[in-house]
């Protein structure tokens, strides 16, 4: 009897507060997807992050040109301090296709490199309108994309 009463109370509370729940989460995510596509499309973005420890970790600096056509051009550089006090610098470039999709309830940047590498990076829109990856990297819009 007590279990039945508990279930009835729970059901009544659920029905009572259902209108106050943010039900259209899918619609909100779709708005973010469209916003992030517009934010990235046609712009050059600088991404910086570090892998490894604070002393001998590797710092990455990426300049990514997100073309409105769905293509991207990436110019990357990594920098790492060696045990001997030298700095090891590597430069590379990449290209491929990009899109913003819904992934596990988040807006996410999906890319496929011409080399075949692919990834999905969850993104968020900050209160000031900037877009930020949820991976801990720093991202800043720095100009118009140079697309051919």
Language model regions located:
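Positively charged n-region of N-terminal signal peptides that target proteins for export
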Residues: 1-5, 98
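Lipid interaction determinants
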Residues: 25-148
């Amino acid at each position: 009897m007590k279990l039945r009463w508990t279930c009835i109370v729970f059901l009544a509370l659920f029905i009572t507060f259902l209108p106050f729940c943010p039900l259209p989460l899918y619609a909100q995510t779709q708005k973010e997807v469209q916003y992030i596509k517009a934010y990235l499309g046609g712009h050059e973005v600088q991404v910086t992050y570090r892998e490894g420890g604070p002393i001998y970790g590797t710092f990455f600096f990426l300049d990514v040109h997100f073309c409105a056509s769905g293509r991207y051009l990436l110019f990357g550089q990594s920098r790492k301090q060696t045990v001997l006090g030298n700095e090891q610098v590597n430069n590379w470039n990449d290209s491929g296709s990009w899109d913003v999709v819904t992934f596990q309830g988040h807006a996410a940047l999906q890319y496929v490199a011409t080399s075949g590498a692919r990834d999905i990076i969850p993104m968020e829109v900050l209160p000031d309108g900037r877009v930020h990856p949820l991976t801990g990297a720093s991202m800043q819009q720095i100009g118009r994309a140079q697309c051919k």
